[in-house]
């Protein structure tokens, strides 16, 4: 028990008690080691121990949290500075800057309900402070009218009484030195549902700030506000009919029941309140606050409402938990996300890459075609002489002058005496006459595959006249069109067999192949030699 006028740490003299809470007491004291004997605030913190001996990990954690408070106070003018910290026996002490001024609770008691303009100025003055601590992954967890002081010197809102040390001191320590659970602190009514469950998020601070603004506008604490039984949303506008639409919209979103429906950052809330999306300075807190009554007043730093303690599991061996009260800051997003400048820079680059890739692929394909030209078309042309079998009936044309050899099928080879190959070109009709009997000659092409060496000249079928050899059907390529008349020949040959009845005479040897083909009708005329015999 600390008594007034007692020196703490042989240096700080207690002037009066400012308040008591679940975690200890708050005193107003003087620093006797300073020439000015400046006033300071001393927080006496009592850990929850079941063992009289303080475990070493708790001392280390208290040291880390004190270092965090020191860093915050030194880098932001709207957060009290930490002068010192020490421990005596089983208790811990923090020595902080004294802020002359009024808490929002005291200011409301003096002035009554705030106007919309005054509340907007207050929010724009405190939101940069919240953004500052949230960027360092710290959650205040106990924002309420008692923990915001309007500084007497300039009227700026000062954020006090961070919950980080309270959470450390609220850790229950078992007799074996281990922690049974940690506490989730906050003030009933100002505490969001997820914070009451021991899982505070950054928007939990915005929820508490929204309820603080409602208190300043209506004079009602959260316990006296009605809510929608279906959605859980707070119904407060009927108590502040003169509130501006913009401010009302901002407060409504800040106090949404579900964290995902609130602002994802203090910056977003400030920008919406200002009605634009310009960047709001988050570290200077240069917005003028609501000026309070003239004259020097002292600020009571103790909370007027009790702080709720909720047990949540905690691992005492987690030496990395410098800020165990914080969580991963996933809700914060930069306002310059998706800058149009980046789109104009990235899109042309993507288009150029696509075009360049297409051109490179085209060059590669053409180079491959040049290096590996497709096979020459000559091969299919060489195969074109397929009509050779249809040309083979040509040798039968030469045999036509002597249809008698038809019975002597084995002697077709000597018959190709027709040296007058040129005549073959002029008598396609005659060809049609004789093929009647050459049908068996179709069997001959199989034994006459000797022309196989000749397919090379077949590429140019015109030189047919050069082929005088009976075996080589070189002239065959020229009459390539003749194969079509072949099917028509059989019906025309039917009249020819009549003269063949008189043909059995010896004339074949008398009339060698020297006779011209145009005299093919000679067989019927052959009766003339018969006349002399009759004579």
UniProtKB/Swiss-Prot annotation:
Residue span of region Disordered: 371-535
Superkingdom as given in the UniProt entry: Bacteria
Enzyme category, top tier: transferase
Catalytic reaction annotation: L-seryl-[protein] + ATP = O-phospho-L-seryl-[protein] + ADP + H(+); L-threonyl-[protein] + ATP = O-phospho-L-threonyl-[protein] + ADP + H(+)
Protein EC: 2.7.11.1
GO molecular function: ATP binding; protein serine kinase activity; protein serine/threonine kinase activity
Residue stretches of biased makeup (Low complexity): 422-435
Protein kinase domain boundaries: 12-277
Skewed-composition ranges (Pro residues): 402-421, 446-464, 472-498
Record InterPro entries: Kinase-like_dom_sf, Prot_kinase_dom, Protein_kinase_ATP_BS, Ser/Thr_kinase_AS
One Pfam family recorded for the sequence: Pkinase
Residues annotated to bind ATP: 18-26, 43
ATP-binding found in the keyword field: yes
Active-site residues, Swiss-Prot/TrEMBL: 142 (proton acceptor)
SUPFAM superfamilies named among the record's database cross-references: Protein kinase-like (PK-like)
Keywords, sorted A to Z: ATP-binding, Kinase, Nucleotide-binding, Serine/threonine-protein kinase, Transferase
Stated family: Belongs to the protein kinase superfamily. Ser/Thr protein kinase family.
Protein name: Serine/threonine-protein kinase C
